[in-house]
């Protein structure tokens, strides 16, 4: 049960119910309930949900991403070699989804954006070049 978060929950649901794709960044101090807010608001609506690994290497982060894809029902042919390939796999999962609206939740992004990982570059390419164009895609952080 969410207490004192009605306004934030309403804003998230407004983004979800919109007719266009939305990129929502939720940020704030650690341990204040951001992840809980997202999970309670979107309970069974996630097309994909992933949390970065604290102190994980690039290879460990990519392996975790593959594991999250598989948990969402995508059969990954291999662990992606880089973030561009990882986001291509996410695109395929989204294409395969029969849900009318897709919610992608990426938690702990700073842990994935390690030096020289190019995570943000791949995320920008995914969002600007593909995800923002559709009306059935939502991404939450």
What function would you assign to each model-found segment?
Residues 1-141:
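Phosphate-binding site recognition
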């Amino acid at each position: 049960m969410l207490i004192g978060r009605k306004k934030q929950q309403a804003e998230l649901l407004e983004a979800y119910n919109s007719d266009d794709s939305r990129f929502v960044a939720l940020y704030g101090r650690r341990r204040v309930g951001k992840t809980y807010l997202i999970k309670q608001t979107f309970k069974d609506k996630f097309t994909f949900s992933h949390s970065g690994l604290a102190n994980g290497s690039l290879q460990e982060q990519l392996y975790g991403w593959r594991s999250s894809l598989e948990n969402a029902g995508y059969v990954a042919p291999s662990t992606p070699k880089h973030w561009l390939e990882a986001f291509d796999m996410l695109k395929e999962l989204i294409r395969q989804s029969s849900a009318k609206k897709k919610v992608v939740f990426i938690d702990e992004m700073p842990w994935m954006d390690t030096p020289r990982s190019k995570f943000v570059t791949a995320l920008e390419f995914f969002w600007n070049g593909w995800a923002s164009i559709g009306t059935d895609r939502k991404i939450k952080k």
